[in-house]
Amino acid sequence: KTFFNQEAHIYYFLGCLYEQQEENAKAETAYKSAAVYKAAVSEISLFRALALKKLGRAEEAQRVLDEMLSVAENFIVNKDLRSYFGVGSPSPMPFEYDIEKNNMVDGNVLKAFALLGLDEREKAAAAINKARELSPYDFRIYIFDSLINQDVIYV
């Protein structure tokens, strides 16, 4: 296990399940685990923000979502620049060298997840559709599609 492992989605949904069972102490523990800061910003950061909201830490949640939007916009604006490749960082496969396409997909997917956390569904759908045009089989798009109408996302 490394510091970069992101498990917020697992703990967030576990917290939701405990909440449904009215096991509030266990739900709070799960939400606290989901709210732990991880160094990498990704779509999974949405679940950290949602957990922070559940814990009554709305300002922190807003900062997480704002950071997601900032990183997403950076991908989109600087679509022709490669990201830093360090240990544990994602790196393209040999057949994924269209860096502009990759950055546009990554930026729009991340933006969509952040907007989902802000309950801006129409803007989120528009962002995910831009990504879908470029990479229709990206797994993150399927995840987004399964989340957009789930009540557990809107805290």
Indicate where each model-derived feature is located.
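Alpha-helical junction/boundary sensor with strong preference for TPR arrays
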Residues: 1, 37-38, 72-79, 135
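Flexible helix-coil transition and linker loops at the boundaries of alpha-helical arrays
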Residues: 1-4, 94-100
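Residue signature of alpha-solenoid helical repeat architecture, marking inter-repeat boundaries
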Residues: 5, 39-41, 46, 102-104, ...
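"A position-specific structural signal for the A-helix of alpha-solenoid helical repeats
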Residues: 6, 12-13, 47-49, 54, ...
